[in-house]
Amino acid sequence: ARGLAQQIVAASTGDIAALSVQVQTMGREFAECGFSGALATYAVSWLNDALSQRVVALCAQGARLPAASWCWVNLGSAARQEQTLTTDQDNGLIFTASDEAEAEELRSVFLPFAREVNRQLSDAGFTLCPGDIMAGNIKWCRSLDEWVQLFYNWIHKPEPEALLNATIFFDLRPLYGDLDLASVLHQKLAQWSGGSSAQIFLRLMATNALTAEPPIGFTGDIVTEKDGKDRFIDIKKFGIRIFVDAARIMALSAGVPDADTRTRFLKAGPAFGMNERDIEATLGAMSALQRIRL
């Protein structure tokens, strides 16, 4: 994996697609060699990070970007480093601006760059997000002040859309650029989510999370979904999501800035009465589901 990562760091634009195929192949080998689900998904995510960083760097070299600080951020499973072999894009862009007028001016420059990154990532196998949660969308290419205000509104005015957005955007990790810009958002989240005014938001998030239940019927039988002649269980929706949602809520409540589920449980779990054995058992169950999903 380290040798492949070194190839990615030195890659040209024309090399990226072939290297992405190698990452997919290596990911399958991880699963076949008996890696745990957690380790295999982390390894795939680590290599995907390297690919994405290289694409962003190459696009930045070819663009005439302004002097303003900026940061490309991963969201969702990419931020949590819990990606499987098939993944789509969830990303955003943060930049600094002195006021609203400058933010609009800078956005007009950053948007074409962000859209080119999204296009090249798509060419490399990272499918465009069906919900358009990407930096090339004007809604997710924002100044730091705009992101701060947006996060504040979601926590203090928890409408249904805000709760949905929180499950994606509050799993945020800087990938490339001025990483401190993302740290500011993490600090604000920790400050706001730990306050009394955020309790309604956290309760609503918990209520929403409880709608995801294991696919077990009243008689204890497994409930499946149908796709043509085949029946299946959506492991992400009815399995992994339960762990991810719980860890997110616990981390927000405890002021833990980390995005990955394992670290969230390790750091925030004790505040919710989980001992070391509880945490390891929980993570082991999630890892087993991740391995099946690979």
Question: Across the structure, where does each feature detected by a protein language model lie?
Answer:
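Glycine- and acidic
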Residues: 32-41, 94-104, 226-232, 273-275
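Conserved nucleotidyltransferase catalytic core and NTase-mimicking acidic/glycine-rich helix/loop elements
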Residues: 68-69, 180-294
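Active-site nucleotide-donor binding segment shared across nucleotidyl transfer reactions
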Residues: 48-106
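Secondary-structure capping and boundary motifs in well-ordered enzyme cores
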Residues: 74, 78-84, 109, 113, ...
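Conserved structural-core and active-site-/substrate-pathway-adjacent residues in large, well-folded domains
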Residues: 48, 88-90, 121, 246, ...
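Cation-handling catalytic/transport regions enriched in His/Asp/Glu
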Residues: 72-73, 81-85, 91, 128, ...
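Tandem CBS (Bateman) regulatory domains
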Residues: 1-18, 22-26
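Conserved catalytic core of two-metal-ion nucleotidyltransferases
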Residues: 19-31, 37-54, 58, 62-64, ...
